[in-house]
Amino acid sequence: MEMASAFTLNVRLDNIAIITIDVPGEKMNTLKAEFASQVRAIIKQIRENKELRGVVFVSAKPDNFIAGADINMIGNCKTAQEAEVLARQGQQLMAEIHALPIPVIAAIHGACLGGGLELALACHGRVCTDDPKTVLGLPEVQLGLLPGSGGTQRLPRLIGVSTALEMILTGKQLRAKQAVKLGLVDDVVPHSILLEAAVELAKQDRPSSRPLPVRERILAGPLGRALLFKMVGKKTEHKTQGNYPATERILEVVETGLAQGTSSGYDAEARAFGELAMTPQSQALRNIFFASTDVKKDPGSDAPPAPLNSVGILGGGLMGGGIAYVTACKAGLPVRIKDINPRGINHALKYSWDQLEGKVRRRHLKASERDKQLALISGTTDYCGFAHRDLIIEAVFENLELKQQMVAEVEQNCATHTIFASNTSSLPIGDIAAHAARPEQVIGLHFFSPVEKMPLVEIIPHASTSAQTIATTVKLAKKQGKTPIVVRDKAGFYVNRILAPYINEAIRMLTEGERIEHIDAALVKFGFPVGPIQLLDEVGIDTGTKIMPVLEAAYGERFSAPANVVSSILNDDRKGRKNGRGFYLYGQKGRKSKKQVDPAIYPLIGAQGQGRLSAPQVAERCVMLMLNEAVRCLDEQVIRSVRDGDIGAVFGIGFPPFLGGPFRYIDSLGAGEVVAIMQRLATQYGSRFTPCDRLVEMSERGESFWKTTATDLQ
């Protein structure tokens, strides 16, 4: 039986050809190499039908146009030449679409990304819906690649080089109103009239490109271009620290096309695409993509999740406010916040207002939609309105007795099916559930701050948590837009446990004489978004160090922080950015204010600030301890798989994505090399660097954590 086609042609009575995109058996339309023959057959029919007036591409999927190319095609390429051929085939197909003698219009609703936008760019005009689901972008850089089907050449000519570079270098996605303002689309219409609007455009002469703004025309000239690429190159190098080769190649390819013409530009694009596809950075980033997709499909347990119709939150502080926001505004669930103080409720409501009002100001959201989402959140100082909540998230202070009291109160005031989920970062879930009448419905749900930005949550069942409670909590996390990993109920869980020795070692080097800015710069150069000392300031020194004694009590001396350093800093009322002084000093303009190292830190902790270590040596000491602890977590079944370990580190800590996560990174170095480095460091700095047994065994056997495929585990 012949497989259904992803592209089908229908000709209307008014002689407009409608090409419907509908990849069989898939929720999302993605482009595959085998579709080229289908599109070419349709192009041939269009060319042969002299009665046709225009062509419209439209998707049959309810919420996406084309989400991009199928990434598996790249993984199947064994050489740069094979990947280059793939790009050239894509370029050729887009050129054939563009060469049609009648107007070709893309009718866009939902995600139009990567190869999907490149197809739309090959059309002569574009119409999109004003729906929030409609986004347009070229996110290939996030996979260590560049657009390979003409995107680097068509986009700068359509919207201007500086705007195009921002989109291609960052993977930034535009909403409909931004897209029409920049000239990326010709019109924005309601979804109900999308097809008719596209048909009307197709009946006209080919839409002419809007003239570029004067600034963009100047920047496209030789002098403006030279200045622009120099400035953007410098800014990009600072941002990527040279760790992402794709950004450098994007600049090179776009400039080639502008300076030497489209033929040279397309040639450079295809060659760069092929070479980037073979880089370890792209392979690691694609592995992260596959792993995160896999995690999002994981139900957490074999049991079916319980229905989720409404949620309660205990505590209206920073975390409670953030959790209320993602629950109401991302998951779309009614939220009831309980706080002992009305000010706590007001704080939580203001948190959501600020987030939504920012979207309204940026024209990402209508005021009516803001009001609709805010109406989902309400507050109370007692348990009024909690009787039928399906799940309660506790976000009160880190105090065991208080959390146990919350469990008792929820069991008294809520339905018998209600799940109690604690947002603890350090307390054992088993202890929180110790006196529960229904311990099987108690679970940990650990969010990271700021809640609306951090993609990871840890879901922590204790020994008696039911499979259905796990599945229901995983379901909620996904509805909130989070990537959940299920971890074991042991001190520090996973993320904080691997983060603690990393930060401890940074503080230890500080006491040895390394300068604060040198330590932070070394880890940023390695690939972390911020250095460990700045991270401590951002989280809050009081908050970030609270877990240290818990971990030391559980795991011993390797988690001990340098004596008296933390207490000296806290006793000097240094909490980090939140009170304007930590290891750094901050101005008065909140989170955006500039920071500078406070030189008073050095005498306060008895350090000289005269370092001797190179940046790679600093990074090595911090990172090796993190890797060792990650392997211990796998060995102790704190994490269920290396997949979860890599995702947890990348999404929870900012472990360099281009290295693929701790386990991918160990594999790339080789377990033998990691063991050798750690043994050398143990000789130099002490037993905390002793490699764990599993690493030593893997070294002796020549084993790796991951198999060669993207999703299979060893």
Swiss-Prot record:
CDD domains: crotonase-like. Residues 1-190 are annotated as: Enoyl-CoA hydratase. InterPro entries: 3-OHacyl-CoA_DH_CS (IPR006180), 3-OHacyl-CoA_DH_NAD-bd (IPR006176), 3HC_DH_C (IPR006108), 6-PGluconate_DH-like_C_sf (IPR008927), ClpP/crotonase-like_dom_sf (IPR029045), Enoyl-CoA_hydra/iso (IPR001753), FA_oxidation_alpha_subunit (IPR050136), FadJ (IPR012802). Disulfide bonds: none annotated. Keywords: Cytoplasm, Fatty acid metabolism, Isomerase, Lipid degradation, Lipid metabolism, Lyase, Multifunctional enzyme, NAD, Oxidoreductase. The keyword Lipid biosynthesis does not apply. The record marks 118, 140 as: Important for catalytic activity. Residues 306-714 are annotated as: 3-hydroxyacyl-CoA dehydrogenase. The keyword Zinc does not apply. GO terms for biological process: fatty acid beta-oxidation. One of its GO terms (molecular function) is 3-hydroxybutyryl-CoA epimerase activity. Its main location: cytoplasm. Pathway: Lipid metabolism; fatty acid beta-oxidation. Catalyzes the formation of a hydroxyacyl-CoA by addition of water on enoyl-CoA. Also exhibits 3-hydroxyacyl-CoA epimerase and 3-hydroxyacyl-CoA dehydrogenase activities. Heterotetramer of two alpha chains (FadJ) and two beta chains (FadI). In the N-terminal section; belongs to the enoyl-CoA hydratase/isomerase family. This is Fatty acid oxidation complex subunit alpha. The lineage of its organism: Bacteria, Pseudomonadati, Pseudomonadota, Gammaproteobacteria, Enterobacterales. The gene is fadJ.
